[in-house]
C-alpha cells in the first residue's frame, strides 16, 4: 500500500476513534438496552408524551450506533480493498485502485459528517426543535417562498426518518403561506437546525408576474428548542388570553365546522401563538402552549445572553439578517453567506439536500464561539 494511503487511513482511524470516544459507544449500547426495556413495557403508552420521547430517543440512539459501526467496518475493509487491487494487473489493477480510492473518499466524507455530530454540545442541542417560518418582503412570491422553505425542511427530515408534526399553517390569500410552525421530533434536532436561523433570500423569475420579471423574496426561519420540565417555564392561566376560531385553509377557506383552532396571547410579553392542525380544541391548545413555552424560553435565553454581552452587533447581524441566498435566475446557485459554502443545484437543495449547509454551519458556529 502506498505510504500516502497508509497515512490517510491512520488519520481516518484517529478521527473515528475521537468520534467513538465522544459518543461513548459503550454507554450508548447501555442506554439502548435501557430504552429497549422501557419500550417493551406494556404500560408505556399510558403516557403518550413519555412514550414518544422513549421511542424517539431509542430510534436515534440505534441509528447513531449503526452509523458508527458501519464506518468502523468500512474502514477495516479498506486495506483489504487496496491489497486486492494491488494483486491485479493492467486495467483490472487500475479499475480496482480507482474503486478503493472512491470508497476512501466517500468514507472521509461520512466520517467528517459524523464528526460534526460531536460538535453539538450546547445546553439545548440535544432537544427536539420547533421551526417557525415567516414570509417577508416580496408579496405573493415571499409567501410562496416561505412554503418552499417549509417543504425543504420537511423533506430533509423525511430523508433522515425524523418525525415531523405541523402545529400551525397560516395560508396566504393567493399562494403560499404567511407563516408555519412545526416540530422536528428527534434528539439533536435543535442543535442541528439552529444553524438555519436567519433570513433566506430567493431570486427567480416570478411565476406570478405576467411580464416574467425577476423577483427577490425573503423569508425568516426561527428555530427553538422544545421546552422540558427541567426548564421551569411556568405560564399561569392569568397571564394568557385564549381565543378560538375555525381552522382555515388556502385562500382563507374554512376547513372545519367547529371552533377548534386556538390563538394564545401571552399578556405580559405580547407573544401570540396559534395552532389549528390538530383535530380538537384541547389538542390545539396543548400544542400552542408548547410553542409559547419555547418562545418564552428563547426570550429568557436572549436576555441572559444580553447580560453576558453574547449578543454583540456582529453576531446578531449574522443570525438576524441574510444568511443564505438561493438564486434560480440568471444562474443557479445556493450560497451560505456566513460560511461561503455553495452548490450549483438549487433543485436538490430545495428537495431537502441541505446536510452540507448544516455541517458547514455547525463548524462555522464552533469557530465563531472559540474566537469570541
Swiss-Prot record:
The UniProt entry, under NCBIfam families, shows: prfB
Task of the protein: Peptide chain release factor 2 directs the termination of translation in response to the peptide chain termination codons UGA and UAA.
- Residues recorded as bearing N5-methylglutamine in the entry: 253
Q: How is it modified after translation?
A: Methylated by PrmC. Methylation increases the termination efficiency of RF2.
Tell me yes or no: is Metal-binding among this UniProt entry's keywords: no
Pfam families, per the entry: PCRF, RF-1
InterPro entries, sorted: PCRF (IPR005139), Pep_chain_release_fac_I (IPR000352), Pep_chain_release_fac_I_sf (IPR045853), PrfB (IPR004374)
Q: What is this protein called?
A: Peptide chain release factor 2
Instruction: Mention one GO molecular function.
Output: translation release factor activity, codon specific
Where does the record say this protein resides? Cytoplasm
Q: Which superkingdom heads the taxonomic lineage of this protein's source?
A: Bacteria
Similarity comment:
Belongs to the prokaryotic/mitochondrial release factor family.
Q: Which source organism?
A: Nocardia farcinica (strain IFM 10152)
> What PROSITE patterns does UniProt report for this protein, alphabetically?
RF_PROK_I (PS00745)
Q: What is its main location?
A: cytoplasm
Keywords annotated in UniProt = Cytoplasm, Methylation, Protein biosynthesis
Q: Which GO terms describe its cellular component?
A: cytoplasm
Amino acid at each position: 500500500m502506498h505510504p500516502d494511503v497508509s497515512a490517510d487511513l491512520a488519520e481516518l482511524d484517529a478521527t473515528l476513534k475521537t468520534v467513538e470516544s465522544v459518543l461513548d459507544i459503550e454507554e450508548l449500547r447501555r442506554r439502548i438496552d435501557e430504552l429497549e426495556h422501557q419500550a417493551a413495557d406494556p404500560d408505556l403508552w399510558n403516557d403518550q408524551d413519555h412514550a414518544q420521547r422513549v421511542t424517539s430517543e431509542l430510534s436515534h440512539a440505534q441509528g447513531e450506533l449503526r452509523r458508527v459501526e458501519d464506518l468502523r467496518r468500512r474502514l477495516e475493509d479498506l486495506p483489504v480493498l487496496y491489497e486486492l487491487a494491488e494483486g491485479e494487473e493492467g486495467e483490472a489493477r487500475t479499475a480496482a485502485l480507482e474503486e478503493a480510492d472512491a470508497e476512501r473518499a466517500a468514507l472521509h466524507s461520512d466520517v467528517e459528517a459524523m464528526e460534526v455530530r460531536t460538535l453539538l454540545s450546547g445546553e439545548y442541542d440535544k432537544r427536539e426543535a420547533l421551526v417557525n417560518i415567516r414570509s417577508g418582503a416580496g408579496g405573493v412570491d415571499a409567501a410562496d417562498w416561505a412554503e418552499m422553505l417549509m417543504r425543504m425542511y420537511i423533506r430533509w427530515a423525511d430523508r433522515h426518518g425524523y418525525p415531523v408534526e405541523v402545529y400551525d399553517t397560516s395560508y396566504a390569500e393567493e399562494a403560499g403561506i404567511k407563516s408555519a410552525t412545526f416540530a422536528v421530533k428527534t434528539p439533536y434536532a435543535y442543535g442541528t437546525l439552529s444553524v438555519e436561523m436567519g433570513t433566506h433570500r430567493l431570486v427567480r423569475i416570478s411565476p406570478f408576474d405576467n411580464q416574467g420579471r425577476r423577483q427577490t423574496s425573503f423569508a425568516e426561519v426561527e428555530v427553538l428548542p422544545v421546552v422540558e420540565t427541567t426548564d421551569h417555564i411556568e405560564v399561569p392561566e392569568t397571564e394568557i388570553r385564549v381565543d378560538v376560531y375555525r381552522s382555515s385553509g388556502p385562500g382563507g377557506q374554512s376547513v372545519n365546522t367547529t371552533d377548534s383552532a386556538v390563538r394564545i396571547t401571552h399578556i405580559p410579553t405580547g407573544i401570540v401563538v396559534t395552532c389549528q392542525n390538530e383535530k380538537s380544541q384541547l389538542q390545539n391548545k396543548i400544542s400552542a402552549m408548547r410553542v409559547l413555552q419555547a418562545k418564552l424560553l428563547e426570550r429568557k435565553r436572549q436576555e441572559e445572553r444580553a447580560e453576558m454581552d453574547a449578543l454583540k452587533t456582529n453576531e446578531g447581524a449574522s443570525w438576524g439578517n441574510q444568511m443564505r441566498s438561493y438564486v434560480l435566475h440568471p444562474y443557479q446557485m445556493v450560497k451560505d453567506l456566513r460560511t461561503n459554502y455553495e452548490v450549483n443545484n438549487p433543485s436538490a437543495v430545495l428537495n431537502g439536500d441541505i446536510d452540507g449547509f448544516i455541517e458547514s454551519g455547525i463548524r462555522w458556529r464552533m469557530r465563531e464561539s472559540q474566537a469570541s
